[in-house]
From Swiss-Prot:
Gene Ontology annotations of biological process type: mitochondrial electron transport, ubiquinol to cytochrome c
UniProt-listed Pfam families: Cytochrom_B_C, Cytochrome_B
UniProt-listed SUPFAM superfamilies: a domain/subunit of cytochrome bc1 complex (Ubiquinol-cytochrome c reductase) (SSF81648), Transmembrane di-heme cytochromes (SSF81342)
Localization annotation: Mitochondrion inner membrane
Protein name: Cytochrome b
Organism: Pronolagus randensis
Record PANTHER family: CYTOCHROME B
Transmembrane segments: 33-53, 77-98, 113-133, 178-198, 226-246, 288-308, 320-340, 347-367
Main function: Component of the ubiquinol-cytochrome c reductase complex (complex III or cytochrome b-c1 complex) that is part of the mitochondrial respiratory chain. The b-c1 complex mediates electron transfer from ubiquinol to cytochrome c. Contributes to the generation of a proton gradient across the mitochondrial membrane that is then used for ATP synthesis.
Domain of life the protein comes from: Eukaryota
Cofactor: heme b
UniProt entry keywords in alphabetical sequence: Electron transport, Heme, Iron, Membrane, Metal-binding, Mitochondrion, Mitochondrion inner membrane, Respiratory chain, Transmembrane, Transmembrane helix, Transport, Ubiquinone
Misc remark: Heme 1 (or BL or b562) is low-potential and absorbs at about 562 nm, and heme 2 (or BH or b566) is high-potential and absorbs at about 566 nm.
Phylogenetic placement of the source organism: Eukaryota, Metazoa, Chordata, Craniata, Vertebrata
Positions with a binding annotation for heme b b562: H83, H182
């Protein structure tokens, strides 16, 4: 008798994606981050659902409802901190996942890569709107500053901002709609993730060598289900360590003060995972230019497949490209640090140099390195 998982219409799909899926035999721990992102999304949806049961999206009661969750709801403090730090874990996994894609040339699967960029934008939008919900000082002022950037769009800018706000400032209407969007977007992310996987399974996974692995495939289960489970345990442990021992390590103390439109915080800054983009935005002294640079800092990922000049797919055997890749990582860390600093000397200059280097590395230096490596290998 044929196994039910191979014949049942629904189980057949699960079987082809998670059990009998042919996978390369040599994929390293860098290939774990996709499943870890799936776990993060599930954690965020469940903790978010329980938070939404007790949260009220009204400017008068939002802050106190968040406090009420921490003080009066059974394990409410844990649910809230798992959700807040779960977002940080989500972005750590996201950046590692994208970094892996760049290093090993996974971006040559252009459909998968482009859906991935769309997912990145959607997750960033969701996280931004979630940060507004507790209605602390940084929630209000972060929302005001970031939404105000749209006013740089010529002609329609001001009208667009007021349309998003639902008034003439970030107020009750804004908070209510942000809550609605923050609730629906994770489900859109889940749907996009399925499309992401659909495109990936059309081609099969890449592997560290960048060489086609059709001649050497192994079943996903049990080999990679066990490997993913180890990743799940490590991620869960790290998240629990964060949530139970240092829940406010990655947050901003200003967000424990209720939102006050009459009092501006000394340093308005987003959560740590947006600081690199925020630093790029601030490094350009023109509003529209800054907004374009901000969008391009993520959208630049879309041109990476077009600028692949090397005859090899992966960077595994390309020392010159490897060096540039790790300089890019260091540059992003520098930008993250600068984004959290006040706008004064020497931080302004460091931010500008790091921003120029970021775009130069991706658009000029890395494609150039590919050509040089081809030349050295006489290809």
């Amino acid at each position: 008798m044929t196994n039910i998982r191979k014949t049942h219409p629904l189980l057949k799909i699960v079987n082809h994606s998670l059990i009998d899926l042919p996978a390369p035999s040599n994929i390293s721990a860098w290939w774990n981050f996709g499943s870890l992102l799936g776990l993060c999304l599930v954690i965020q949806i469940f903790t978010g659902l329980f938070l939404a049961m007790h949260y009220t999206s009204d400017t008068m009661t939002a802050f106190s409802s968040a406090t009420h969750i921490c003080r009066d709801v059974n394990h409410g403090w844990l649910i809230r901190y798992l959700h807040a730090n779960g977002a940080s874990m989500f972005f750590i996994c996201l950046y590692m996942h994208v970094g892996r894609g760049i290093y090993y040339g996974s971006y040559t699967y252009s459909e998968t890569w482009n859906i991935g960029i769309l997912l990145l934008f959607t997750v960033m939008a969701t996280a931004f709107m979630g940060y507004v919900l507790p209605w602390g000082q940084m929630s209000l002022w972060g929302a005001t500053v970031i939404t105000n950037l749209l006013s740089a769009i010529p002609y329609i800018g001001t009208s667009l901002v007021e349309w998003i706000w639902g008034g003439f400032s970030v107020d009750k209407a804004t908070l209510t709609r942000f809550f609605a969007f923050h609730f629906i977007l994770p489900f859109i992310i889940a749907a996009l993730a399925m499309v992401h996987l659909l495109f990936l399974h059309e081609t099969g996974s890449n592997n560290p060598s960048g060489i086609p692995s059709d001649s050497d495939k192994i079943p996903f289960h049990p080999y990679y289900t066990i490997k993913d489970t180890l990743g799940f345990l490590m991620l869960t442990m790290l998240l629990l360590l964060l949530a139970l021992f240092t829940p406010d390590l990655l947050g901003d103390p200003d967000n424990y003060s209720p939102a006050n439109p009459l009092n501006t915080p000394p340093h308005i800054k987003p959560e740590w995972y947006f600081l690199f983009a925020y630093a790029i935005l601030r490094s350009i002294p023109n509003k529209l230019g800054g907004v374009l640079a901000l969008v391009m800092s993520i959208l630049v990922l879309a041109v990476i497949p077009l600028l692949h000049t090397s005859k090899q797919r992966s960077m595994m055997f390309r020392p010159l490209s490897q060096a540039l890749f790790w300089i890019l990582v260091a540059d992003l860390m520098t930008l993250t640090w600068i984004g959290g600093q006040p706008v004064e000397h020497p931080f302004i200059t460091i931010g500008q140099v790091a921003s120029i280097l970021y775009f130069a590395l991706i658009l000029i230096l890395m494609p150039l390195a590919g050509l040089i490596e081809n030349k050295i290998l006489k290809w």
